[in-house]
Structures are given as C-alpha cells and as structure tokens.
Amino acid sequence: SQLAPKELRVVVGAHRELVENHVKEISPKAVTVFQAERNGTGHAVQLALAELSANGNVLILAGDTPLLRSETLSEFINAHRTNKNVASVLTAELPDPSGYGRIVRGEDGEIVAIVEERDASDELKAIDEINTGVYIFDIATLKTSVQKLNKNNSQGELYLTDVISQIKSEGGKSAAILSLDYTETLGINDRSQLAESAAIMRDRINDCHMRAGVTIVDPTTTWIDTTVEIQNDVTIYPGTWLTGATKIATGSVIGPRTTLKNVIVKAQANIVESNVSDSEIGCCANVGPFAFIRPGTKLADNSKVGAYVEVKNSEIGEGSKVPHLSYVGDAQIGSGTNIGAATIFVNYDGVEKHETKIGNDVRIGSDTMLVAPVSVGDGAYTAAGSVITEDIPAGAIGVARSKQRNILGWVLRKRPGTKSAESAKKAGASEN
C-alpha cells in the first residue's frame, strides 16, 4: 500500500475461506480476523484491536468502498494529525444519501454524532452529508471507547459510529472531514451499485491511459485492469477488454471486440475481434478477425493468424501465416511458412498430446491433416486434401489422398427426377 501501514488487519465473516485466500494473494503480510457472529461494526473493531499496539493511530476502512484513492486517504490522515484529533471521520455529500448514516453537526459546524438511517428521524434523513465508513482514531482511546458500546439501537448491534459522540462527550477532539469527490466513497450493497462503481473505476483507468497518449475510441465500452501496461500511441477500438498482466507496446492496434488476458503485445501489432490469453504477439504481427489464441502461443514478428483460426501452445515463426479456418495445436512452425485454409494439426490421440514440427518456407496445402507426431522439412509442400501421417523430407511434396474416380451417369440412375438429374440431362449426360 502507498500508505505504508505498520500492520494491516482484515475482519472477515461470510465466505471466510474465499476472502482469506484473496487477501493472502494481494497482501501476504495482512492478518485476517474472523468475526463469527456479526454484531456490528463496533464488534468487528473490538476483534481487530486485540493484540494491537496501544500507540499511534489506526485507520479504519469499510471493505465495500473500493473507489477510495490513496491520495484522498493521505490527505485525510494529514488533516487528522495536523489538527491533533483523537477521532476523525471522512464524510461526503451525496445527491441521494439513502442507506447511509448521517453526519450531525452542531451550531459551530463541528460533528456532534453519526446517526444510522434506521435510527434517524425524518429531519435527520434530510441531511445529505453521510458517513463514508472511513475513520482515524487514537488507538488507546479507541480501545477504551469500544468497550463502552451498547446495543441500544434498531439493529441490536454495536455501532462504531457511537464512538464519535462518546469521545466528543468526554472532551476528546473529533472532526468530520468532507471528501471533495463523493464518488470515491460510494459503497457496494447490490449488483447495481457494483456496476456503478465498476464504471467509475473504468473511467478513471481509461482517462489515465488517454492522458498518457493512448487512443481509446470509445471509453465507455473499453475495460482495462489496473495491472495492464500500455505504451503511448496504442489505439484501442470499442468493445475491448484488457486484463491481467497484459502489456501492449507502442503503435499497436487492439480491437474492436477483443479480449486480451496476460498477453505480451509487441510494437505495431494488430489484433482485431479476437480472444487471446497467456500468449505473446510479435512486432507487426496480425491476428484476426475471430481468432482464438490460447495459452502458450508465441507469434513471431510479421506473422499472421487470420479469420477463424485457433492456436494453442504453438510457436509460429517470423513471417509465417495461418490465414484461414485452421486449428494449430502443439506445433513448432518455422519462418516464411504458409498454412493453407482448413488445415488441422491433429495433436490428440485420445490419451496424449503430440507435437508437429513444420520447417522454414513450407507450403501446407488447403484441407491438410497433419497427424502428430509428424514433421515437415524446410521448403516442403503438402498436396491439398492430404492426411499426413509420416514425416516429409525437405524439398519434397507429401501426397496422401485416394485417387479420384468419376462414376458416369450415377446421378441419373440413383437420383432420377431431381433438379440435379434434370440439369445433368440438359448438359448431355446419360445413364450409361
């Protein structure tokens, strides 16, 4: 974290194992605390404070406010320290404060109390300044105060918000600090609010990339993870989703309607209407439309994977092309090679996967089946429609198909009365 806390504790309840595993992934040093009975925010803080040092300040955040910026929290912490507060709460003014606790201020403008909506009168519900669930407390004071909490409220829970009025009544200095951007403080309680927050985060991320020199044609339909790295002068077309450890080099064009997950894209590459994951796309390579690039694939510079091509765990050499309607699995393809339309790399025997090796400057004829394990030497050809089951030496052509036989008059004898038979008769065909 940019805030560099001395210790990080996360209180978990529902779906404990899933949450704990995720916390370990993103913050291995964080300590998780289990709240078996959900007795309110005050109870959660009681559990988190156990065995925590009594010195310094503690920052408390809600787990459902993911839009908070570290800069906002830094300013909040600095204001708390500068004013030597015992307790501070971050607030926001919302267009619709429904569902949030209200901030009650005195005539002097200072905070008097925080009242949860279920406990608020109609007069208090008219207040649009709300509690964001972000606090800073002096640890020693907080430890004492949370032990005094009671359940005298509509939900029968221990409210952390009651600590503010308690500290105030005991002469401690408390403050409500207003956030300038209320969207940072939005909470998530349902799928609608989740979608709203996701859209805000999307816009933030896209704005950052655009200001750094990335062209995003339609930011509202372009979704980019925070983990993605994009160099300047990249163009992203509508309907694109970039996730994971994806890195895109300068001059590349991505989309429209393209998904990249953990993909390294080198300079000047072009990927259109395709799905690519855990792969590497070389400089000036072309992918799509409608290509499916699966994990373990490496496309060298100036290579091409075209329309309706699926590639899995394969390396395609510099300048090589798989232009149309093919499946390439577990293959090594050299440079300057062309794979004809409808070629299938038959890599699976029902039990194990096998590798196919294709050399440099090879020409694979359309509708060829390469039954692995098999290899095709440099400069070799395969005849269209062949089923290749044996290695082809360099410079040879592999022909593996039955000889064509024309049976004259078959349509007239076997399909009499059909349109085909009528056309054949007009063309001079006979039954003999």
Named regions from a protein language model:
Residues 1-78, 82, 419:
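Conserved N-terminal catalytic core of the sugar/cofactor nucleotidyltransferase
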Residues 8-10, 48, 64, 103, ...:
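Residue-level signal for inorganic ion chemistry
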Residues 17, 21, 28, 68-154, ...:
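Conserved core of the sugar-phosphate nucleotidyltransferase
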Residues 66, 128, 135, 157, ...:
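Residues that recognize and position ribonucleotide moieties
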Residues 270-432:
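Glycine-rich hexapeptide-repeat left-handed beta-helix
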